[in-house]
Amino acid sequence: MNKANLLHIDTNIKITLLAEVSVGISANSILFIAYLCMLLGENRHKPIDLYIAFLSLTQLMLLITMGLIAVDMFMPWGRWDSTTCQSLIYLHRFLRGLTLCATCLLNVLWTITLSSRNSCLAKFKHKYPHHISGAFLFLCVLYMSFSSHFLVSMTVTPNLTSENFMYVTQSCSLLPMSYSRTSMFSTPVAIRETFLISLMALSSGYMVALLWRHKKQAQHLRSTSLSSKASPEQRATRTILLLMSFFVVFYILDTVIFHSRMKFKDGSILYCFQIIVSHSYVTVSPFVFICTEKHIIKFLRSMCGRIANI
């Protein structure tokens, strides 16, 4: 991809990308602040709330980093040096991988939380809250090692056009790598993503079975003239299934666009589309939490009421 072409991409694409980043930053900030206030408040909170706060913070940092990269792609105010390129691209890749793993673990933890007492997962219910901090630390160390090659493969974009460099932004490019070296870095990533997607598929399948069982119970309750309102378990199950549906759709689109880019030498527009699609989930997911979690809605309403009374 020619570095000059990024500056001449259609204005609508630039606006879409920057708007997506801005909306995502705002939504994740609201979600993180809401959960942080609930965690620091006197009200009792669920152990999984801490993990949702961690996920929203990770997504917020990812979008902020992407915003800085997007500015250098379209509106370069000054060339970055090699250290800035390596640090920002490394941080972005690290946060992107960490977000994927955190989403997967949130799915698994939610499955454990909603499992019945007779389920084989019930024995983990009282164990996982005590291991969340350790899981955070393990994930950070793991994904720091996964992304470490960007510290040595990222360099300042040369002034002269070269087909051997892969342009990331106006200031940063990836150094050319041999096929064996590329495979050495890409294989662990492929294995990681395959494992995480499979784990999410299994937990989502369990969720579907759980939702079907609750639906049968609801039909029985209606037949006995009892309340037919959705239970907290049903609402939580629908929330996580909705999140996973968004994740799968955006992941498939991202994969299709990535392979399409590989077929074109000058895929600047596809490159921007891939960035938009790959960050769509982290932009949409906080809205799912905000709109479906009743305690978040109540908290935001109370905050708005306090602000209005000031």
From Swiss-Prot:
TM regions (residue ranges): 21-41, 51-71, 94-114, 132-152, 191-211, 239-259, 269-289
Glycosylation sites: N159
A single Gene Ontology CC term: plasma membrane
Cytoplasmic side: 42-50, 115-131, 212-238, 290-310
GO terms classed as biological process: response to pheromone; sensory perception of chemical stimulus
Topology class, membrane: Multi-pass membrane protein
Domain of life: Eukaryota
GO molecular-function terms, A-Z: pheromone receptor activity
Extracellular face of the membrane: 1-20, 72-93, 153-190, 260-268
Disrupted gene: phenotype observed: Mice lacking all but one V1ra and V1rb gene (12% of the V1r repertoire) show a lack of chemosensory response to a subset of known pheromonal ligands and changes in maternal aggression as well as male reproductive behavior.
Keyword field: Cell membrane, Disulfide bond, G-protein coupled receptor, Glycoprotein, Membrane, Pheromone response, Receptor, Transducer, Transmembrane, Transmembrane helix
Function field: Putative pheromone receptor implicated in the regulation of social and reproductive behavior.
Similarity comment text for this entry: Belongs to the G-protein coupled receptor 1 family.
Official protein name in the record: Vomeronasal type-1 receptor 44
Protein's gene: Vmn1r44
